[in-house]
Regions:
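A post-motif C-terminal structural segment
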Residues: 1-178
């Protein structure tokens, strides 16, 4: 639920796969005890509006890009971003972590030639830089301290993490309606 709210496609996909595993365990139990087992699976709502196909990939998908993402946005926030905020970490240092955790690679990185579809464009770098600078300004403040533009770009989430998730989603040919 929270992964979809935050437009974190990779974490959402992992959640669905884990749900599938849980349902399979219930089906296996049912097969062993069919007369005394009822399986009921429900959801309260869909969040995020995940869509496959994105304009900058000509609506092709590159879902293998998502395999480079090693943790959810929430774990990235707590493991890395909170430290960036506290220490005013330089953008280039943060981007090394983004490369290690999400696979997104700066054009100036020595490994840029082998980054493939995860090589960032100048436009993407600028969007990430703006989101990072905004993150250092507002930290993990409440929405009341963020501008309307911040809200439209990042929702109620930390700008840098959302920009990273949006970027890997788009490079993978995915988007969200929220």
């Amino acid at each position: 639920d929270w992964a979809c709210h935050a437009n974190d496609a990779a974490a959402s996909i992992h959640d669905v796969l884990e749900m599938s595993n849980a349902v399979q365990a219930a089906v296996d139990f049912y097969n062993a005890h069919p007369n005394e087992t009822l399986i009921l699976v429900t959801a309260d709502h869909e969040t995020g509006g995940m869509a496959i196909g994105y304009k900058t990939t000509n609506y092709d998908t590159f879902l293998t890009n998502l395999a480079h993402q090693k943790m959810s946005y929430a774990k990235f926030d707590s493991t890395y971003v909170q430290g960036y905020i506290a220490n005013k970490t330089p953008f280039e240092t943060a981007m090394q972590d983004v490369k290690n955790v999400f696979g997104l690679t700066l054009p100036t990185d020595p490994a840029a030639a082998s980054a493939g579809k995860l090589l960032l464009t100048d436009y993407e770098v600028e969007n990430l830089r703006k989101a990072y600078e905004r993150t250092l300004q507002v930290g993990s403040s409440s929405q009341s301290k963020m501008s309307q533009q911040d809200y439209e770009l990042y929702g109620t989430y930390i700008p840098f993490s959302m920009a990273v998730c949006h970027t890997i989603n788009h490079k993978s040919g995915m988007d969200h309606t929220t």
